[in-house]
Amino acid sequence: MEATDRHYIATLDVGTTTIRCFIYATSTNGEPASIGTAYDQVQLIYPAPGWVEINPDKLWTSVLQTIRKATEDANLSMDQLTCLAISTQRNSFTCWNRNTGQVYHNFITWKDLRADQLVKDWNNSLMLRVIKLGASFLHFFTRSKRFLAGSVIKLMNPQVTLRLSWVLQNNPSLKEDLKTGNVLYGTIDSWLLYRLRQGTDPAGPVEHISDVTNCTSTGFYDPFGEEWAGWALSLFSIKKELLPKVVDNSYDFGHVHETLLGTKIKIAASVSDQSASLWGTCCFERGDVKITMGTGSFLNVNTGTKCLASVHGLYPLIGYKLQSGKDSMVDINYLMEGASNDTGSIIEWALNMGFFEDPAESASMAMSVPNSDGVLFVPAFSGLGPPIQDDSAGSGFIGIKPSTRKEHMVRALLESLAFRVALLHDCALKETGFSFTSIKVDGGVSKNDFICQTLANLTGIVVERGEVTDSTAMGAMFMAGLNCGIWNTKQQLVDVRKVEKKFSPDMTQRTKQLKQMRGWERAVDRFKKWYILEDIKNLD
């Protein structure tokens, strides 16, 4: 290809609350630029308390409309697109009929709590205790990291495992069709790949696939063995024929069928949101760490070519897997991940409660006072994840006094988000033994200077924010461009990524803020196990 060749990559990003499509223009080995965008809201459905769903038909319509609108915004025709890259939220799934394409139920999202009692029952079950004891015994003799991971296994609501088990038990038509082997399961990426290649014929036969980064976080995929975990499928009665073929991120995903957008478009990459943001922040080296602060916060540590076990609540994942070159060299990368499910959701709640009129105001409000006047906030709408691990924790302010102003409460709220992420950072240090030199942040909440500076002070290392904070779409585009030969090496991606701001730790504030964090941890202790207290339960 000539250096002047122009390429246009459409990147579809299906998140928890929004669907976005970006059109990027670039020349071979050149710097990309976003020339067209389109957005749509994901319409979440709440059919029962704790249930969170997405209507597949509405999602499908929105996906096609968003791609069309973004292409129009870029003043391009569909046949000018070089390829399509896809990034999706993880662990939201549906099941559909192989012969008719008809879904059996809405997408059950990763935030859904319908299987909460199953999760609690299994985590307290004799069976799981036996499995953990057996894994611990085997680890003692083999020193295998796989068995070490098994010795501390804990089921979680965001994983697919028990929500899928719930569906298999409670959907009559699905249970009936399971007998004939015509039921297919898939997360959003798998379902979209199926529909996009199928075209307008819902019964058209296509390969049932899912990329490895979307499979690895489901709870029944083994990142050590790179396969569906047979023990989990057996334990939770999940038939393997339901499941998609697991493929690399450089797989030949085929084309968008011409009946959908008027022309065939090459699908050059499919990748999960967190792995895509890893690429968007260019965390390609062992020891690199990035924190995505969106609806929730996700800390990912690049552990290189080794899959590490966790004993403090983080979990190992496959970050990406590529095959390239004539000799099919495999480039596989592992992550250690920790999550806090409430970050952007806390900001949105504060906005709705009238603490500020625009989230952009919150940083200046927090900095307008020297401290929080002793007020602390615990951000636990969805409980508290690692290293605290308490699904029944409550949220709330503590330490409010007659002198407390709105600015103090906003500062306490923002500080709590930084404290929560700093805990994940400390946990990652213990798990990996790495020495981090910087943290790359992305996601909407990373635009908040107060949170970024507080995080730098607490961790004692530089926090780096890229010029593009929506790095999920950028990362999927990078991966597609590499797969298509627009770029030849990951180093070229590092070279074209731009840094918008670096937050260096203020050592004069570090001691004070670490002390505040210790006080915040005492407040967290007050809110632990809140929703299992009998007098609290009786308030409902």
In which residue ranges do the predicted regions lie?
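Glycine-rich phosphate/pyrophosphate-binding loops
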Residues: L242-P244, N488
